[in-house]
Amino acid sequence: MFIKKDRKLARQRKHLRVRRRLMGTPERPRLSVYRSLRHIYAQVIDDTRGVTLVAASTLDPALKGLESTGNITAARKVGELIARKALAKGINKVVFDRGGNIYHGRIAAVAEGAREAGLNF
């Protein structure tokens, strides 16, 4: 019980440290990624206005036919979807916010999928 709580607290502290250095602007918004056990969520945020510009997740209707929503292939699809939505709104450069997680596995898959679809980091 305590280990799980400590791990969550450590991730939150890491995220605060990362967020001190990252700031999304209108020219280069922040691509924030959140990972739960079953799903993965990504959103492009303009921090100066405090507005979410684009959002995508494994719960999105465009990704309805996925076999599993908590694996690397689903995360890559979310990355591709968020990139397509961002490019449609005229956003082609972002700052990647890993959300206190290690840049590995599903977090890295979102970034790779977004890069492959044309988003620049």
From Swiss-Prot:
Alphabetical keyword list: Ribonucleoprotein, Ribosomal protein, RNA-binding, rRNA-binding
Coiled-coil region(s): none
Top-level taxonomic group: Bacteria
Pfam families, per the entry: Ribosomal_L18p
An example Gene Ontology CC term for this record: cytosolic large ribosomal subunit
GO molecular function: 5S rRNA binding; structural constituent of ribosome
GO biological process, one term: translation
Presence of the UniProt keyword Glycoprotein in the record: no
Subunit structure: Part of the 50S ribosomal subunit; part of the 5S rRNA/L5/L18/L25 subcomplex. Contacts the 5S and 23S rRNAs.
Family: Belongs to the universal ribosomal protein uL18 family.
Function text: This is one of the proteins that bind and probably mediate the attachment of the 5S RNA into the large ribosomal subunit, where it forms part of the central protuberance.
Protein name: Large ribosomal subunit protein uL18
